[in-house]
């Protein structure tokens, strides 16, 4: 898997992600089908994964981002293209941030379209408009951490909010946890009751040998 960023000019960027599978056991993966609300936006991921082995080089992302600052402390980013493995689209983000504070807030709105299972440029018959209000806070105390609260409409059309905590260490290691609560009932969601998880990123080059956490 390869991630590349092309800087076309100081305010225009093109980001790509290309994938190639050397070996996998994805044929053994089983995900029960979803036949109730929310819409099946992720549970058919195996339809994408089964093409990884024989699909050659696959496009995970091909995204164009344009940044502008129309006024002091007001930042806008407009994006279009293939956002990720399963969705393409277009949209924009607004962020208000002042350098002397430890918080920011903003809004993002995106129109997204579900990609075809072959990972190329075709689209399936699903689309939605996502919109969220966002608040970000950075704690500089003894145990520094970042907090993010987002509220709005999500990919499946459900409405609710997400609470996320994360921490970035001096050597570049990054990890966190999140929980999302929406108007989807426990019965509709199924196993797990609500969306939650952890995430992490461990660099394999650069400053990883710095153990000053």
Residue ranges and their predicted role:
Residues 1, 16-18, 47-50, 72-84, ...:
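Transmembrane beta-strand segments that form the barrel wall of outer-membrane beta-barrel proteins
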Residues 1-64, 68, 121-125:
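Outer-membrane beta-barrel initiation region
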Residues 2-6, 64-68, 92-96, 133-137, ...:
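Residues on the lipid-exposed face of transmembrane beta-strands in outer-membrane beta-barrel proteins
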Residues 6-14, 69-73, 99-104, 140-147, ...:
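Short loop/turn motifs that connect adjacent beta-strands in outer-membrane beta-barrel proteins
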Residues 22-28, 72, 84-88, 100-102, ...:
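Gram-negative outer-membrane beta-barrel proteins
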Residues 36-42, 124, 140, 144-162, ...:
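Flexible, glycine-rich linker and terminal segments associated
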Residues 56-62, 86-90, 125-131, 157-161, ...:
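Residues that define the transmembrane beta-barrel architecture of outer-membrane proteins
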Residues 73-75, 81, 85-86, 93-146:
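Detector for outer-membrane/organellar transmembrane beta-barrel domains
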């Amino acid at each position: 898997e390869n991630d590349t960023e092309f800087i076309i000019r100081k305010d225009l960027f093109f980001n790509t992600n290309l994938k190639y599978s050397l070996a996998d056991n994805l044929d053994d993966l089983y995900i029960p089908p979803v036949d109730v609300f929310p819409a099946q936006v992720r549970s058919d991921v195996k339809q994408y994964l089964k093409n990884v082995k024989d699909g050659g080089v696959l496009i995970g992302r091909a995204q164009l981002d344009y940044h502008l600052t129309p006024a002091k402390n007001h930042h806008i980013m407009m994006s279009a293209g293939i956002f990720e493995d399963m969705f393409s689209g277009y949209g924009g983000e607004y962020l208000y941030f002042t350098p002397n504070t430890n918080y920011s807030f903003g809004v993002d709105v995106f129109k997204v379209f579900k990609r075809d299972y072959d990972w190329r440029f075709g689209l399936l018959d699903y689309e939605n408009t996502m919109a969220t209000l966002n608040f970000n806070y950075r704690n500089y105390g003894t145990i520094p951490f970042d907090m993010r609260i987002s509220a709005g409409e999500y990919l499946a059309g459900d409405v609710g909010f997400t609470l996320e905590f994360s921490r970035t260490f001096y050597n570049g290691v990054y990890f966190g946890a999140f929980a999302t609560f929406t108007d989807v009932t426990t019965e509709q969601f199924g196993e797990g009751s609500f969306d939650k998880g952890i995430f992490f990123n461990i660099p394999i080059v650069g400053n990883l040998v710095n153990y000053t956490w």
